């Protein structure tokens, strides 16, 4: 899969050859090619699937019974949510924010000293490392993390988690100055700008990590704050990321309160352009869609969270028809319950095909592009395809699992979308390093990470038994 060879091209017996953190060759494998690689590189090789790791002959280059893909690219998510899976279910977005997100992030902040002593590290780092495990488990090697709520104060921890995991990450740093938890309001709004300046100075040179503005919602950020954040984005040449029109009641409340939709509001302050990435964009008017199209803004669809929280689904077919670019992502583990990005792609298509009674909409090839090459282009990352010069980000999916048998060249992409359950990701390579090999994590201490998150989740449950109930977060405050 590459722009050069064709994003829908399938190769029966292919290979990818990497050096350091880049792909230097990709294409059809032949015995002659294998002999050349052995001759040129000798023991300076790591051959995935080989039984030995030195003194290679061409016979050691095995044909893995896997499907080789680009590493998946997640264009919207939250890395603090693993410990709140299953909390505050069967409720709408704003109730879930009250009952899960803000309770948990407030717990981490309020009990920070106690939790740090317990774990010997920042409790935020504990949960962010679990999010790295979640992504790698499902083959996600690059992401844009919307670092909202109390998390906006803990960027150093997420940068460290990304460094340890050897993944790529854009950190969209949150802000709020109205209609939100009083403890985290950025009043005066220069606090949000000062925070970005500080993070940019501290982390500008950190490899595989980028800082951008990530105001939480249009309803929670006033016009002067959004204008200042947009100026910062332009001055620094970055993207800017925001939730938009996600939940129907809040979207309707916003229009009643401010006399315009969130998109009309954004347009009125010149917030929207080709550098603007909108998460969700579920609830729209025809005028909203026309504004988005004209502005060049892009949309990230998160079907797992949108369905679980009852937010609705965006008009993807209309967006396609008028030329609004969109990709598919998972959102956070707390609202989506997992980071199975193949499931997200399947869920998006299932709904749209059924709703429009059009089985031809969102084919398997298109869906795969919307979790690889297209989000990589959205995020300006040098990944998402298998071709010379791209970052060495790859996923090997195990084709020996019963749900993926039979797989052939003509049905492999269809099987990945419709038959996989996410657990078939066998090996993951990111930036030239093997992160997961034959289902085993190679860089992260998997057992320690999952044990700490299990303990943290139990401590949160105890805390919630006596914690003050939070109400009115988001809208209607």
List the predicted regions and their residue ranges.
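N-terminal metal-binding scaffold of metallo-dependent hydrolase/deaminase domains
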Residues: 1-55, 471
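Alpha-helical scaffold segments that flank or form the walls of functional sites
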Residues: 67-68, 87-167, 194-205, 454-456
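Histidine/acidic-residue-rich catalytic or RNA/ligand-binding cores of hydrolases
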Residues: 155, 248-260, 288-293, 310-319, ...
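His/Asp/Glu-enriched, well-ordered alpha-helical/loop segment
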Residues: 268-275, 317-403, 419
């Amino acid at each position: 899969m590459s722009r050069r060879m064709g994003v829908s091209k399938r190769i029966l017996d292919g290979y990818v050859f990497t050096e350091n953190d880049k792909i230097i060759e990709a294409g059809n494998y032949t015995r002659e090619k294998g002999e050349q690689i052995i001759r040129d590189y000798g023991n300076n090789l790591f051959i995935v699937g080989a039984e030995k790791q030195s003194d290679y002959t061409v016979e050691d280059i095995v044909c893995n019974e896997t499907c080789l893909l680009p590493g998946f690219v997640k264009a919207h998510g939250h890395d603090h949510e693993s410990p709140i899976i299953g909390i505050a279910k069967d409720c709408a977005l704003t109730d879930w924010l009250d009952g899960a997100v803000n309770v948990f992030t407030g717990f981490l902040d309020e009990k920070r000293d106690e939790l740090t002593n317990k774990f010997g590290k920042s409790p935020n780092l504990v949960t962010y490392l679990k999010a790295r495990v979640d992504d790698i488990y499902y083959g996600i090697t690059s992401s844009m993390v919307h670092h909202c709520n109390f998390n906006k104060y803990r960027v150093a921890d997420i940068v460290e988690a990304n460094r340890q995991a050897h993944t790529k990450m854009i950190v969209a740093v949150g802000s709020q100055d109205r209609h939100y938890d009083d403890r985290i309001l950025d009043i005066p709004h220069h606090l949000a700008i000062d925070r970005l300046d500080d993070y940019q100075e501290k982390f500008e040179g950190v490899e595989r990590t980028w800082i951008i503005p990530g105001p939480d919602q249009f309803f929670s950020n006033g016009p002067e704050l959004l204008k200042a954040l947009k100026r910062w984005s332009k001055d620094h040449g970055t993207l800017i990321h925001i939730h938009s029109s996600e939940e129907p009641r809040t979207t309707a409340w916003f229009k009643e309160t401010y006399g315009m939709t969130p998109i009309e509001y954004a347009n009125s302050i010149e917030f929207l352009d080709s550098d603007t990435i909108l998460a969700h964009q579920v609830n729209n008017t025809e005028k909203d869609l026309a504004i988005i199209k004209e502005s060049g803004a892009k949309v990230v669809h998160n079907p797992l969270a949108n369905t679980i929280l009852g937010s609705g689904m965006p008009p993807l077919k209309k967006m396609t028809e008028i030329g609004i670019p969109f990709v598919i992502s998972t959102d956070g583990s707390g609202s989506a319950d997992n980071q199975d990005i193949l499931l997200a792609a399947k869920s998006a298509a299932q709904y749209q095909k059924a709703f429009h009674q059009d089985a031809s909409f969102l084919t398997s090839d298109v869906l795969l592009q919307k979790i690889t090459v297209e989000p990589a282009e959205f995020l300006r990352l040098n990944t998402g395809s298998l071709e010379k010069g791209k970052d060495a980000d790859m996923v090997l999916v195990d084709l020996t699992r019963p749900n993926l048998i039979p797989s052939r060249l003509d049905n492999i992409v269809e099987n990945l979308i419709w038959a996989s359950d996410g657990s078939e990701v066998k090996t993951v390579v990111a930036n030239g390093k093997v992160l997961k090999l034959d289902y085993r994590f190679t860089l992260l201490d998997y057992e320690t990470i999952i044990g700490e998150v299990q303990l943290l989740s139990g401590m949160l449950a105890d805390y919630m038994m006596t914690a003050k109930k939070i109400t009115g977060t988001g809208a209607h405050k």
